[in-house]
């Protein structure tokens, strides 16, 4: 039996989600159409609303509905420490540790040579402007301990070499190959606390 074109289009669209293969996308599509049509409507409206209202924070590059996100607009946060993460979910995980009160910069990506993603695919110029605006004394590199995260940290360390900033890397208490969003709060808090300063030779 041939799948209707509109249903096939929905299945294909759902496959853009990370970790969703053909079978999972098919199950999702059937569920939305048969068992939860109201949910399908809410999902469509929520996606449309998010696309219409979300933009990037002018300072940290995370998603925000205003020019500055909630954290960047909070003058009670430390202004002299900047933690660089790959994705908004990573910053959220660090916030949940309640062990960091500085600010963030979200790359919205990473360096991944195998995927054809180079340093030109992350906002290095915007990050440099933010880190070198005169208020930041320390940059914490909190990219994942994956091959891509390490490559990204190397690029960032090179960027800030000889710029007069203290550059540190979160400690290797995190498992090799581990991603921040999957690490428990206690382990992540300890990794932040035990962060090591990078020397010129590390860049």
Curated annotation (Swiss-Prot):
Keyword Ribonucleoprotein: no
Signal sequence segment: none
Zinc finger C4-type: from-to: 57-72
Cysteine disulfide partners in this protein: none
Domain of life: Bacteria
Key words, A-Z: DNA damage, DNA recombination, DNA repair, Metal-binding, Zinc, Zinc-finger
Residues annotated as domain Toprim: 80-175
Family listed: Belongs to the RecR family.
PANTHER family: RECOMBINATION PROTEIN RECR
Name of the protein this chain belongs to: Recombination protein RecR
Annotated organism of origin: Laribacter hongkongensis (strain HLHK9)
